[in-house]
């Protein structure tokens, strides 16, 4: 599922949960979608951090 559709579905289930009680299937789906979203974000952050290079700083005397 692409990120836009994932977020739309998460938001839909959240709004629905505020208006009425979610079924057990919907609660399970909501948990899975949230976990998938978090895993995608973690993966993106990891890739970005792996691409970061440390820039050496010159030794300074104060």
From Swiss-Prot:
<dbReference type="Pfam" id="PF05979">
    <property type="entry name" value="DUF896"/>
</dbReference>
<dbReference type="GO" id="GO:0005737">
    <property type="term" value="C:cytoplasm"/>
</dbReference>
<protein>
    <recommendedName>
        <fullName>UPF0291 protein CLJ_B2839</fullName>
    </recommendedName>
</protein>
<comment type="similarity">
    <text>Belongs to the UPF0291 family.</text>
</comment>
<dbReference type="InterPro" id="IPR009242">
    <property type="entry name" value="DUF896"/>
</dbReference>
<keyword id="KW-0963">Cytoplasm</keyword>
